[in-house]
Amino acid sequence: MAKSMRTIKNPFFTSHPPSPFFHLSLLFFTPLKKSSPRYLNHHHQTRCPPPQFFLLLISLSLVFSGISFLTFSLDTGSSTCVSTSSASSLKFFISDVDHRQILTSLAVSGASTLFPLPARGGHSGNMTEEEKEFWKQPNGEGYKPCLDFSLEYKKKSASVSKEKKRFLVVVVSGGLNQQRNQIVDAVVIAMILEAALVVPVLQVNRVWGDESEFSDLFDVEHFKKTLRSDVRIVSSLPSTHLMSRQTIENQIPWDVSPVWIRAKYFKQLNEEGLLVLKGLDSKLAKNLPPDLQKLRCKVAFHALRFAAPIENLGNKLTRRMWIEGPYIALHLRLEKDVWVRTGCLTGLGSEFDRIIAETRTSQPRYLTGRLNLTYTERRLAGFCPLNVYEIARLLKALGAPSNASIYIAGGEPFGGSRALEPLAKEFSNLVTKETLAHKGELLPYTNRSSALAAIDYIVSLSSDVFIPSHGGNMAKAMQGNRAYVGHRKFIMPNKRAMLPLMENSSVSDAELSFLTRKLHRKSQGYPESRRGRRDRDVIAYPVPECMCRHRKHRSVGFF
Protein backbone atom coordinates (compact mmCIF):
# COMPACT_ATOMS: atom_id res chain seq x y z
CA MET A 1 0.00 0.00 0.00
CA ALA A 2 2.80 2.38 0.90
CA LYS A 3 4.37 1.82 -2.47
CA SER A 4 1.19 2.70 -4.32
CA MET A 5 0.81 5.85 -2.26
CA ARG A 6 4.22 7.10 -3.31
CA THR A 7 3.35 6.45 -6.92
CA ILE A 8 0.17 8.44 -6.55
CA LYS A 9 2.00 11.39 -5.03
CA ASN A 10 4.59 11.50 -7.82
CA PRO A 11 3.89 14.81 -9.61
CA PHE A 12 5.05 13.37 -12.93
CA PHE A 13 2.39 10.67 -12.96
CA THR A 14 -0.10 12.04 -15.46
CA SER A 15 -2.79 9.42 -15.94
CA HIS A 16 -6.15 9.87 -14.25
CA PRO A 17 -7.89 7.27 -12.10
CA PRO A 18 -11.02 5.70 -13.53
CA SER A 19 -14.19 7.33 -12.28
CA PRO A 20 -16.90 5.43 -10.40
CA PHE A 21 -18.98 5.55 -13.59
CA PHE A 22 -16.24 3.74 -15.49
CA HIS A 23 -16.41 0.83 -13.06
CA LEU A 24 -20.21 0.82 -13.29
CA SER A 25 -20.07 0.74 -17.05
CA LEU A 26 -17.71 -2.23 -16.91
CA LEU A 27 -20.11 -3.99 -14.57
CA PHE A 28 -23.17 -3.56 -16.78
CA PHE A 29 -21.81 -3.36 -20.32
CA THR A 30 -18.97 -5.88 -20.46
CA PRO A 31 -19.00 -7.89 -23.71
CA LEU A 32 -19.94 -11.57 -23.51
CA LYS A 33 -16.84 -13.73 -23.32
CA LYS A 34 -16.55 -16.63 -25.74
CA SER A 35 -14.79 -19.74 -24.63
CA SER A 36 -13.60 -20.63 -28.12
CA PRO A 37 -10.60 -18.78 -29.63
CA ARG A 38 -12.33 -18.58 -33.00
CA TYR A 39 -14.54 -15.81 -31.72
CA LEU A 40 -11.55 -13.52 -31.16
CA ASN A 41 -11.42 -12.55 -34.82
CA HIS A 42 -15.04 -11.52 -34.96
CA HIS A 43 -16.95 -8.53 -33.61
CA HIS A 44 -17.90 -8.83 -29.96
CA GLN A 45 -21.54 -9.35 -29.27
CA THR A 46 -22.79 -7.33 -26.32
CA ARG A 47 -25.68 -8.22 -24.15
CA CYS A 48 -28.39 -5.66 -23.52
CA PRO A 49 -28.96 -5.26 -19.80
CA PRO A 50 -32.48 -5.65 -18.49
CA PRO A 51 -34.38 -2.53 -17.28
CA GLN A 52 -33.61 -3.15 -13.61
CA PHE A 53 -29.92 -2.72 -14.35
CA PHE A 54 -30.62 0.76 -15.71
CA LEU A 55 -32.61 1.62 -12.59
CA LEU A 56 -29.76 0.41 -10.40
CA LEU A 57 -27.23 2.37 -12.45
CA ILE A 58 -29.29 5.56 -12.09
CA SER A 59 -29.60 5.03 -8.33
CA LEU A 60 -25.89 4.50 -7.92
CA SER A 61 -25.09 7.51 -10.08
CA LEU A 62 -27.13 9.68 -7.72
CA VAL A 63 -25.04 8.41 -4.81
CA PHE A 64 -21.81 9.27 -6.59
CA SER A 65 -23.01 12.60 -7.95
CA GLY A 66 -22.13 14.37 -4.69
CA ILE A 67 -18.52 13.22 -4.70
CA SER A 68 -15.96 15.36 -6.55
CA PHE A 69 -12.57 13.93 -7.35
CA LEU A 70 -9.66 16.27 -7.67
CA THR A 71 -8.10 15.88 -11.12
CA PHE A 72 -4.56 16.76 -11.86
CA SER A 73 -2.32 16.68 -14.88
CA LEU A 74 1.28 17.77 -14.94
CA ASP A 75 3.40 17.75 -18.05
CA THR A 76 6.83 16.56 -16.92
CA GLY A 77 8.39 19.76 -18.05
CA SER A 78 5.77 22.36 -18.03
CA SER A 79 2.12 22.15 -17.26
CA THR A 80 0.02 21.73 -14.15
CA CYS A 81 -3.73 22.06 -13.97
CA VAL A 82 -5.51 21.12 -10.76
CA SER A 83 -9.12 20.92 -9.73
CA THR A 84 -9.61 21.65 -6.04
CA SER A 85 -13.08 20.42 -5.19
CA SER A 86 -13.68 20.18 -1.48
CA ALA A 87 -15.17 16.68 -1.65
CA SER A 88 -17.24 17.58 1.37
CA SER A 89 -19.53 14.61 0.77
CA LEU A 90 -16.67 12.35 1.89
CA LYS A 91 -16.26 14.08 5.23
CA PHE A 92 -18.45 11.72 7.24
CA PHE A 93 -16.31 8.70 6.33
CA ILE A 94 -12.79 10.06 6.68
CA SER A 95 -12.36 9.49 10.41
CA ASP A 96 -11.99 5.75 9.83
CA VAL A 97 -9.54 5.98 6.94
CA ASP A 98 -5.80 6.53 6.90
CA HIS A 99 -4.83 10.04 5.84
CA ARG A 100 -2.74 8.80 2.94
CA GLN A 101 -5.77 6.91 1.59
CA ILE A 102 -7.74 10.14 1.81
CA LEU A 103 -5.09 11.99 -0.14
CA THR A 104 -5.10 9.22 -2.74
CA SER A 105 -8.84 9.54 -3.35
CA LEU A 106 -8.82 13.33 -3.30
CA ALA A 107 -5.52 14.29 -4.90
CA VAL A 108 -4.36 12.31 -7.87
CA SER A 109 -0.58 12.29 -8.45
CA GLY A 110 0.22 14.90 -5.84
CA ALA A 111 -1.82 17.95 -6.82
CA SER A 112 0.25 19.78 -4.29
CA THR A 113 2.77 18.67 -1.72
CA LEU A 114 0.19 19.12 1.04
CA PHE A 115 -3.52 18.74 0.42
CA PRO A 116 -5.85 19.45 3.35
CA LEU A 117 -8.73 17.40 4.61
CA PRO A 118 -12.12 18.77 3.48
CA ALA A 119 -13.44 21.83 5.29
CA ARG A 120 -16.14 20.79 7.74
CA GLY A 121 -18.11 23.97 8.29
CA GLY A 122 -20.34 24.41 11.31
CA HIS A 123 -23.53 22.56 12.13
CA SER A 124 -26.80 24.32 11.56
CA GLY A 125 -28.35 23.46 14.91
CA ASN A 126 -28.25 26.11 17.64
CA MET A 127 -25.88 28.40 15.74
CA THR A 128 -26.28 32.12 15.22
CA GLU A 129 -26.03 33.67 11.78
CA GLU A 130 -22.70 35.20 12.81
CA GLU A 131 -21.34 31.77 13.75
CA LYS A 132 -22.52 30.27 10.48
CA GLU A 133 -20.87 33.10 8.59
CA PHE A 134 -17.66 32.58 10.53
CA TRP A 135 -17.34 28.95 9.36
CA LYS A 136 -18.38 29.61 5.78
CA GLN A 137 -15.64 29.12 3.20
CA PRO A 138 -14.83 31.84 0.63
CA ASN A 139 -15.78 31.61 -3.02
CA GLY A 140 -12.73 30.46 -4.96
CA GLU A 141 -14.25 31.90 -8.16
CA GLY A 142 -13.15 28.87 -10.16
CA TYR A 143 -9.41 29.42 -9.73
CA LYS A 144 -7.27 26.31 -9.83
CA PRO A 145 -3.51 25.70 -9.98
CA CYS A 146 -2.28 25.94 -13.54
CA LEU A 147 1.44 25.97 -14.31
CA ASP A 148 1.83 26.38 -18.07
CA PHE A 149 5.45 27.10 -18.90
CA SER A 150 6.40 28.76 -22.18
CA LEU A 151 8.15 26.96 -25.04
CA GLU A 152 11.24 29.10 -24.41
CA TYR A 153 11.34 27.96 -20.78
CA LYS A 154 10.95 24.31 -21.78
CA LYS A 155 13.89 24.57 -24.17
CA LYS A 156 16.09 26.25 -21.57
CA SER A 157 15.13 23.87 -18.76
CA ALA A 158 15.86 20.88 -20.99
CA SER A 159 19.47 22.05 -21.04
CA VAL A 160 19.71 23.21 -17.40
CA SER A 161 18.31 19.92 -16.12
CA LYS A 162 21.36 18.15 -17.60
CA GLU A 163 23.99 20.69 -16.43
CA LYS A 164 27.24 19.09 -15.17
CA LYS A 165 29.79 21.94 -15.25
CA ARG A 166 28.27 24.79 -13.22
CA PHE A 167 27.18 24.18 -9.63
CA LEU A 168 25.36 26.45 -7.18
CA VAL A 169 25.61 25.97 -3.41
CA VAL A 170 23.18 27.95 -1.24
CA VAL A 171 23.30 28.33 2.55
CA VAL A 172 19.87 29.13 4.00
CA SER A 173 19.09 30.48 7.45
CA GLY A 174 16.27 31.40 9.81
CA GLY A 175 13.16 29.50 10.85
CA LEU A 176 11.31 26.93 8.77
CA ASN A 177 9.39 29.31 6.53
CA GLN A 178 12.40 31.58 6.00
CA GLN A 179 14.29 28.48 4.93
CA ARG A 180 11.50 27.48 2.56
CA ASN A 181 11.51 30.92 0.94
CA GLN A 182 15.27 30.79 0.40
CA ILE A 183 15.12 27.27 -1.01
CA VAL A 184 12.49 28.43 -3.50
CA ASP A 185 14.71 31.33 -4.55
CA ALA A 186 17.75 29.04 -4.74
CA VAL A 187 16.04 26.91 -7.39
CA VAL A 188 15.04 30.02 -9.34
CA ILE A 189 18.58 31.43 -9.18
CA ALA A 190 19.97 28.08 -10.37
CA MET A 191 17.66 28.34 -13.38
CA ILE A 192 18.72 31.95 -14.03
CA LEU A 193 22.42 30.97 -13.89
CA GLU A 194 21.87 27.71 -15.79
CA ALA A 195 23.54 25.78 -12.98
CA ALA A 196 23.00 22.51 -11.18
CA LEU A 197 21.86 23.04 -7.59
CA VAL A 198 23.41 21.21 -4.66
CA VAL A 199 20.78 20.33 -2.04
CA PRO A 200 20.68 23.52 0.08
CA VAL A 201 22.70 23.70 3.30
CA LEU A 202 20.71 24.68 6.42
CA GLN A 203 22.62 26.98 8.74
CA VAL A 204 22.29 26.32 12.48
CA ASN A 205 19.54 28.58 13.82
CA ARG A 206 21.15 31.09 16.18
CA VAL A 207 17.94 31.69 18.14
CA TRP A 208 16.79 28.10 18.75
CA GLY A 209 20.01 26.17 18.11
CA ASP A 210 18.28 23.85 15.62
CA GLU A 211 20.88 21.74 13.79
CA SER A 212 18.46 20.09 11.35
CA GLU A 213 19.71 19.31 7.85
CA PHE A 214 17.66 19.47 4.65
CA SER A 215 16.92 15.74 4.74
CA ASP A 216 15.68 16.01 8.33
CA LEU A 217 12.92 18.39 7.25
CA PHE A 218 12.20 17.65 3.60
CA ASP A 219 11.89 14.65 1.30
CA VAL A 220 15.11 14.96 -0.73
CA GLU A 221 14.22 12.42 -3.41
CA HIS A 222 10.82 13.99 -3.96
CA PHE A 223 12.49 17.41 -4.23
CA LYS A 224 14.87 16.14 -6.91
CA LYS A 225 12.23 14.18 -8.77
CA THR A 226 9.68 16.98 -8.91
CA LEU A 227 12.22 19.43 -10.32
CA ARG A 228 14.12 17.03 -12.57
CA SER A 229 12.69 18.65 -15.71
CA ASP A 230 13.59 22.16 -14.50
CA VAL A 231 16.92 22.14 -12.67
CA ARG A 232 19.43 19.38 -12.00
CA ILE A 233 19.68 18.84 -8.25
CA VAL A 234 22.52 16.84 -6.70
CA SER A 235 23.12 15.74 -3.13
CA SER A 236 26.76 16.84 -3.08
CA LEU A 237 29.44 18.43 -5.22
CA PRO A 238 31.39 16.17 -7.57
CA SER A 239 35.05 15.64 -6.64
CA THR A 240 36.11 17.76 -9.63
CA HIS A 241 34.54 20.84 -8.02
CA LEU A 242 35.77 20.45 -4.45
CA MET A 243 38.02 23.32 -3.39
CA SER A 244 40.09 23.91 -0.26
CA ARG A 245 38.81 27.48 -0.02
CA GLN A 246 35.82 28.99 -1.74
CA THR A 247 34.61 32.58 -1.58
CA ILE A 248 31.10 32.90 -0.14
CA GLU A 249 29.00 35.60 -1.76
CA ASN A 250 26.85 37.13 0.98
CA GLN A 251 26.65 40.80 0.01
CA ILE A 252 23.49 40.57 -2.05
CA PRO A 253 21.36 43.74 -2.22
CA TRP A 254 17.58 43.74 -1.85
CA ASP A 255 15.18 43.20 -4.73
CA VAL A 256 17.70 41.97 -7.31
CA SER A 257 16.47 41.04 -10.78
CA PRO A 258 17.42 38.05 -12.97
CA VAL A 259 19.44 40.47 -15.13
CA TRP A 260 21.43 41.57 -12.07
CA ILE A 261 22.01 37.96 -11.00
CA ARG A 262 23.41 36.97 -14.41
CA ALA A 263 25.54 40.09 -14.77
CA LYS A 264 27.02 39.62 -11.29
CA TYR A 265 27.64 35.89 -11.13
CA PHE A 266 27.40 34.13 -14.49
CA LYS A 267 30.94 34.86 -15.69
CA GLN A 268 32.45 33.85 -12.33
CA LEU A 269 30.37 30.67 -12.26
CA ASN A 270 31.32 29.83 -15.82
CA GLU A 271 35.03 30.22 -15.08
CA GLU A 272 35.19 28.57 -11.66
CA GLY A 273 32.35 26.08 -12.01
CA LEU A 274 31.14 26.79 -8.47
CA LEU A 275 29.25 29.60 -6.75
CA VAL A 276 28.36 29.70 -3.04
CA LEU A 277 25.58 32.09 -1.98
CA LYS A 278 24.52 33.00 1.54
CA GLY A 279 22.02 35.49 2.95
CA LEU A 280 19.32 35.07 0.30
CA ASP A 281 16.36 35.94 2.51
CA SER A 282 14.01 38.20 0.51
CA LYS A 283 16.86 39.32 -1.77
CA LEU A 284 15.45 38.10 -5.08
CA ALA A 285 12.85 40.44 -6.57
CA LYS A 286 9.17 39.62 -6.04
CA ASN A 287 8.45 40.67 -9.62
CA LEU A 288 9.90 38.09 -11.99
CA PRO A 289 9.05 36.88 -15.52
CA PRO A 290 5.97 34.60 -15.55
CA ASP A 291 7.93 31.37 -16.04
CA LEU A 292 10.09 32.04 -13.00
CA GLN A 293 7.00 32.87 -10.93
CA LYS A 294 5.51 29.53 -11.93
CA LEU A 295 8.76 27.84 -10.98
CA ARG A 296 8.49 29.46 -7.55
CA CYS A 297 5.04 27.94 -7.13
CA LYS A 298 6.21 24.55 -8.35
CA VAL A 299 8.98 24.49 -5.76
CA ALA A 300 6.87 25.82 -2.88
CA PHE A 301 3.67 23.85 -3.47
CA HIS A 302 4.93 20.69 -5.19
CA ALA A 303 8.62 20.03 -4.56
CA LEU A 304 9.04 20.92 -0.88
CA ARG A 305 7.36 17.97 0.76
CA PHE A 306 8.12 17.40 4.42
CA ALA A 307 10.15 14.34 5.39
CA ALA A 308 7.99 11.23 5.91
CA PRO A 309 8.26 11.07 9.75
CA ILE A 310 7.20 14.72 10.06
CA GLU A 311 4.44 14.35 7.50
CA ASN A 312 3.09 11.19 9.15
CA LEU A 313 2.97 12.74 12.61
CA GLY A 314 1.47 15.95 11.24
CA ASN A 315 -1.23 13.94 9.51
CA LYS A 316 -1.99 12.01 12.72
CA LEU A 317 -2.46 15.21 14.69
CA THR A 318 -4.55 16.66 11.88
CA ARG A 319 -6.91 13.68 11.98
CA ARG A 320 -7.29 14.04 15.74
CA MET A 321 -8.34 17.67 15.32
CA TRP A 322 -10.50 17.10 12.24
CA ILE A 323 -12.42 14.16 13.70
CA GLU A 324 -13.88 16.42 16.41
CA GLY A 325 -15.39 18.84 13.89
CA PRO A 326 -14.42 22.18 12.38
CA TYR A 327 -11.49 23.94 13.98
CA ILE A 328 -9.60 27.22 13.96
CA ALA A 329 -5.82 27.42 13.68
CA LEU A 330 -4.22 30.44 15.35
CA HIS A 331 -0.61 31.26 14.68
CA LEU A 332 0.34 33.16 17.80
CA ARG A 333 3.62 35.09 17.90
CA LEU A 334 4.09 35.16 21.66
CA GLU A 335 7.68 33.94 21.91
CA LYS A 336 10.19 35.97 23.90
CA ASP A 337 12.35 36.79 20.87
CA VAL A 338 9.30 38.22 19.06
CA TRP A 339 8.56 40.68 21.86
CA VAL A 340 12.24 41.63 21.99
CA ARG A 341 12.56 42.17 18.23
CA THR A 342 9.32 44.09 17.71
CA GLY A 343 9.79 46.51 20.60
CA CYS A 344 6.28 45.72 21.86
CA LEU A 345 4.76 44.96 25.26
CA THR A 346 3.46 41.51 26.13
CA GLY A 347 0.19 42.50 27.79
CA LEU A 348 1.11 40.19 30.71
CA GLY A 349 1.97 42.91 33.18
CA SER A 350 4.93 45.02 34.29
CA GLU A 351 6.99 42.07 35.54
CA PHE A 352 7.13 40.44 32.10
CA ASP A 353 7.51 43.74 30.27
CA ARG A 354 10.54 44.57 32.44
CA ILE A 355 12.24 41.30 31.44
CA ILE A 356 11.67 42.08 27.76
CA ALA A 357 12.96 45.64 28.17
CA GLU A 358 16.13 44.43 29.90
CA THR A 359 16.79 41.83 27.21
CA ARG A 360 16.25 44.43 24.51
CA THR A 361 18.71 46.80 26.19
CA SER A 362 21.37 44.11 26.53
CA GLN A 363 20.87 42.82 22.97
CA PRO A 364 19.95 45.85 20.83
CA ARG A 365 20.93 44.06 17.62
CA TYR A 366 17.71 42.03 17.79
CA LEU A 367 15.44 45.10 17.70
CA THR A 368 13.90 45.66 14.28
CA GLY A 369 13.57 49.03 12.52
CA ARG A 370 11.53 52.14 13.33
CA LEU A 371 13.55 52.82 16.47
CA ASN A 372 12.03 56.29 16.82
CA LEU A 373 8.52 54.94 17.48
CA THR A 374 7.09 54.49 20.96
CA TYR A 375 5.34 51.26 21.93
CA THR A 376 1.91 52.88 21.49
CA GLU A 377 2.85 54.20 18.06
CA ARG A 378 4.17 50.79 17.03
CA ARG A 379 1.03 49.05 18.23
CA LEU A 380 -1.44 51.41 16.56
CA ALA A 381 0.59 51.28 13.34
CA GLY A 382 0.10 47.50 13.29
CA PHE A 383 3.75 46.60 13.95
CA CYS A 384 3.03 44.58 17.12
CA PRO A 385 1.64 41.04 17.32
CA LEU A 386 -1.85 40.83 18.78
CA ASN A 387 -1.67 39.70 22.38
CA VAL A 388 -4.04 37.06 23.75
CA TYR A 389 -6.57 39.62 25.03
CA GLU A 390 -6.83 41.15 21.58
CA ILE A 391 -7.01 37.76 19.86
CA ALA A 392 -9.86 36.68 22.17
CA ARG A 393 -11.82 39.87 21.45
CA LEU A 394 -11.18 39.51 17.72
CA LEU A 395 -12.48 35.93 17.65
CA LYS A 396 -15.62 36.87 19.58
CA ALA A 397 -16.24 39.87 17.34
CA LEU A 398 -15.84 37.75 14.19
CA GLY A 399 -18.51 35.33 15.43
CA ALA A 400 -16.37 32.37 16.50
CA PRO A 401 -18.41 30.07 18.80
CA SER A 402 -17.14 29.92 22.38
CA ASN A 403 -17.01 26.11 22.12
CA ALA A 404 -14.92 26.16 18.93
CA SER A 405 -11.86 23.92 18.82
CA ILE A 406 -8.74 26.06 18.45
CA TYR A 407 -5.32 24.75 17.48
CA ILE A 408 -2.50 26.99 18.72
CA ALA A 409 0.47 27.02 16.33
CA GLY A 410 3.74 28.65 17.28
CA GLY A 411 6.62 28.34 19.69
CA GLU A 412 6.56 28.35 23.48
CA PRO A 413 4.80 31.57 24.56
CA PHE A 414 6.70 33.91 26.84
CA GLY A 415 5.03 33.54 30.22
CA GLY A 416 4.15 29.87 29.66
CA SER A 417 0.56 28.77 30.29
CA ARG A 418 -0.21 32.11 31.92
CA ALA A 419 0.16 33.76 28.52
CA LEU A 420 -2.84 31.82 27.17
CA GLU A 421 -5.15 32.26 30.17
CA PRO A 422 -7.14 35.23 28.76
CA LEU A 423 -7.83 33.25 25.59
CA ALA A 424 -8.68 30.04 27.47
CA LYS A 425 -11.17 31.99 29.59
CA GLU A 426 -13.24 32.81 26.49
CA PHE A 427 -12.50 29.68 24.44
CA SER A 428 -12.02 26.57 26.54
CA ASN A 429 -11.17 24.12 23.75
CA LEU A 430 -7.56 25.18 23.19
CA VAL A 431 -5.20 22.56 21.79
CA THR A 432 -1.47 22.56 21.02
CA LYS A 433 0.70 19.94 19.37
CA GLU A 434 1.98 19.08 22.85
CA THR A 435 -1.51 18.35 24.22
CA LEU A 436 -2.67 16.68 21.00
CA ALA A 437 0.28 14.31 20.64
CA HIS A 438 0.42 10.98 22.46
CA LYS A 439 3.21 10.21 24.88
CA GLY A 440 6.57 10.04 23.13
CA GLU A 441 5.36 11.18 19.70
CA LEU A 442 7.13 14.54 19.90
CA LEU A 443 10.23 13.15 21.59
CA PRO A 444 12.24 12.85 18.32
CA TYR A 445 11.77 16.58 17.76
CA THR A 446 13.10 17.89 21.06
CA ASN A 447 15.12 21.06 20.36
CA ARG A 448 14.15 20.86 16.69
CA SER A 449 12.08 23.98 16.22
CA SER A 450 11.84 23.70 12.43
CA ALA A 451 10.35 20.20 12.60
CA LEU A 452 7.83 21.37 15.21
CA ALA A 453 6.97 24.33 12.97
CA ALA A 454 6.42 21.89 10.09
CA ILE A 455 3.95 19.92 12.23
CA ASP A 456 2.13 23.17 13.02
CA TYR A 457 2.06 23.92 9.30
CA ILE A 458 0.45 20.58 8.42
CA VAL A 459 -2.25 20.83 11.10
CA SER A 460 -2.95 24.48 10.28
CA LEU A 461 -3.43 23.81 6.58
CA SER A 462 -6.46 21.57 7.23
CA SER A 463 -8.13 24.01 9.62
CA ASP A 464 -11.44 25.54 8.56
CA VAL A 465 -10.19 29.00 9.52
CA PHE A 466 -6.62 30.24 9.86
CA ILE A 467 -5.78 33.49 11.67
CA PRO A 468 -2.25 34.80 12.35
CA SER A 469 -1.67 37.21 15.21
CA HIS A 470 1.07 38.90 13.21
CA GLY A 471 2.36 39.00 9.65
CA GLY A 472 5.49 37.11 8.73
CA ASN A 473 6.71 34.11 6.80
CA MET A 474 4.27 31.57 8.30
CA ALA A 475 1.31 33.83 7.58
CA LYS A 476 2.40 34.41 3.97
CA ALA A 477 3.13 30.74 3.38
CA MET A 478 -0.22 29.67 4.81
CA GLN A 479 -2.08 32.36 2.87
CA GLY A 480 -0.62 31.16 -0.42
CA ASN A 481 -0.90 27.44 0.28
CA ARG A 482 -4.52 27.73 1.41
CA ALA A 483 -5.26 29.67 -1.77
CA TYR A 484 -3.48 27.08 -3.90
CA VAL A 485 -5.51 24.16 -2.53
CA GLY A 486 -8.89 25.82 -3.03
CA HIS A 487 -8.95 29.18 -1.20
CA ARG A 488 -9.51 28.00 2.36
CA LYS A 489 -10.60 30.68 4.80
CA PHE A 490 -7.71 32.91 5.86
CA ILE A 491 -8.31 36.01 7.98
CA MET A 492 -5.52 38.57 8.26
CA PRO A 493 -6.36 40.88 11.19
CA ASN A 494 -6.63 44.55 10.24
CA LYS A 495 -4.77 45.74 13.32
CA ARG A 496 -4.57 49.40 12.37
CA ALA A 497 -8.34 49.69 12.02
CA MET A 498 -9.58 47.39 14.78
CA LEU A 499 -7.31 48.30 17.73
CA PRO A 500 -8.69 51.87 18.06
CA LEU A 501 -12.20 50.36 18.08
CA MET A 502 -11.24 47.95 20.86
CA GLU A 503 -9.85 50.79 22.95
CA ASN A 504 -12.92 52.99 22.47
CA SER A 505 -15.05 52.42 25.58
CA SER A 506 -18.08 53.98 23.88
CA VAL A 507 -18.21 51.12 21.34
CA SER A 508 -20.49 48.34 22.60
CA ASP A 509 -19.75 44.65 22.06
CA ALA A 510 -22.51 44.45 19.44
CA GLU A 511 -21.10 47.45 17.58
CA LEU A 512 -17.58 46.08 17.82
CA SER A 513 -18.74 42.78 16.35
CA PHE A 514 -20.54 44.49 13.47
CA LEU A 515 -17.63 46.82 12.68
CA THR A 516 -15.00 44.07 13.01
CA ARG A 517 -16.86 41.76 10.63
CA LYS A 518 -17.28 44.66 8.21
CA LEU A 519 -13.54 45.45 8.41
CA HIS A 520 -12.63 41.86 7.55
CA ARG A 521 -15.33 41.19 4.97
CA LYS A 522 -12.81 41.23 2.12
CA SER A 523 -10.10 39.50 4.12
CA GLN A 524 -11.51 35.98 4.12
CA GLY A 525 -9.15 34.18 1.76
CA TYR A 526 -10.86 35.18 -1.48
CA PRO A 527 -8.72 35.15 -4.64
CA GLU A 528 -6.53 38.26 -4.71
CA SER A 529 -4.51 39.14 -7.77
CA ARG A 530 -0.83 39.91 -7.42
CA ARG A 531 -0.98 41.90 -10.63
CA GLY A 532 -0.07 45.56 -10.20
CA ARG A 533 1.45 45.01 -6.73
CA ARG A 534 5.23 44.74 -7.03
CA ASP A 535 5.64 44.03 -3.32
CA ARG A 536 3.40 40.95 -3.34
CA ASP A 537 5.08 37.56 -3.29
CA VAL A 538 3.61 34.99 -5.67
CA ILE A 539 3.97 32.39 -2.89
CA ALA A 540 1.37 34.36 -0.90
CA TYR A 541 -0.65 35.51 -3.94
CA PRO A 542 -0.56 32.74 -6.57
CA VAL A 543 -3.21 34.45 -8.76
CA PRO A 544 -2.77 35.00 -11.70
CA GLU A 545 0.67 33.51 -12.48
CA CYS A 546 0.07 30.12 -10.85
CA MET A 547 -3.72 29.82 -10.81
CA CYS A 548 -6.18 30.02 -13.69
CA ARG A 549 -9.94 30.44 -13.77
CA HIS A 550 -11.33 27.48 -15.69
CA ARG A 551 -15.02 27.99 -15.31
CA LYS A 552 -17.43 29.92 -13.14
CA HIS A 553 -18.01 28.35 -9.75
CA ARG A 554 -20.74 29.35 -7.41
CA SER A 555 -20.01 29.64 -3.71
CA VAL A 556 -20.63 26.41 -1.83
CA GLY A 557 -22.38 26.96 1.47
CA PHE A 558 -22.43 24.54 4.38
CA PHE A 559 -25.92 25.25 5.62
UniProtKB/Swiss-Prot annotation:
Coiled coil spans: none
Membrane topology: Single-pass type II membrane protein
Recorded GO MF terms: glycosyltransferase activity
Keywords of this entry: Carbohydrate metabolism, Fucose metabolism, Glycoprotein, Glycosyltransferase, Membrane, Signal-anchor, Transferase, Transmembrane, Transmembrane helix
Subcellular location: Membrane
Domain of life: Eukaryota
Predominant location category: membrane
Presence of the UniProt keyword Glycoprotein in the record: yes
Residues spanning the membrane: 53-73
Glycosylation positions in this chain: 126, 372, 403, 447, 504
One Pfam family hit: O-FucT
InterPro entries in UniProt: FucosylTrfase_pln, GDP-Fuc_O-FucTrfase
Pathway the protein acts in: Glycan metabolism
EC number(s) on file: 2.4.1.-
GO biological process, alphabetically ordered: fucose metabolic process
PANTHER family found in the cross-reference section: O-FUCOSYLTRANSFERASE 37, OS02G0726500 PROTEIN-RELATED
Name by which UniProt lists this protein: O-fucosyltransferase 37
Organism per entry: Arabidopsis thaliana (Mouse-ear cress)
Protein encoded by which gene: OFUT37
